[in-house]
């Protein structure tokens, strides 16, 4: 089969990025430690929300959100611990989010400072799994005996999928 384009015809365009599902109301976020230092709210910056394979990250500092869009086979993005955070032993991570599509599936894994390139506590991607489209918040247990290095959010062969992160709260 030979495909040809007529002279003067425009080139095909890429698949448009998805538009957001109905979202929750904006939330008020204060970065850093709470008063009794039992919870740390991760600042959403280009350093703390890192793109991996097959992802794009857009941080909106005014809205205090990060939009991650996924495209490709097993794309991933990372939540990185800031360098000025000396104690990164946490019992759980709470992620407040809005999904961009209903049909795509996402999973997660933790990475600790004792082996920075190894994924542990993996939750495999399913449509209604860790980041269900009808939920807007998830609390995920962490190994509180280890220093958290990164938290990985990955897709399962996503095609123009993603979500908006509104807050990341790490609990002692």
Residue ranges and their predicted role:
Residues 1-7:
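Low-complexity/repetitive intrinsically disordered segments
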Residues 2, 13-15, 19:
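Gram-positive cell-envelope targeting signals
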Residues 18-52:
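Extracellular carbohydrate-recognition regions
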Residues 26-33, 39-41, 63-67, 93, ...:
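Generic alpha-helical hydrophobic packing signal
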Residues 47-60, 119-124:
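Short small/polar-residue motifs
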Residues 54-61, 68, 129-130:
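Short, exposed beta-strand/loop patches in secreted or surface proteins that constitute
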Residues 68-147, 155-164, 169-171:
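Extracellular ligand-binding interfaces
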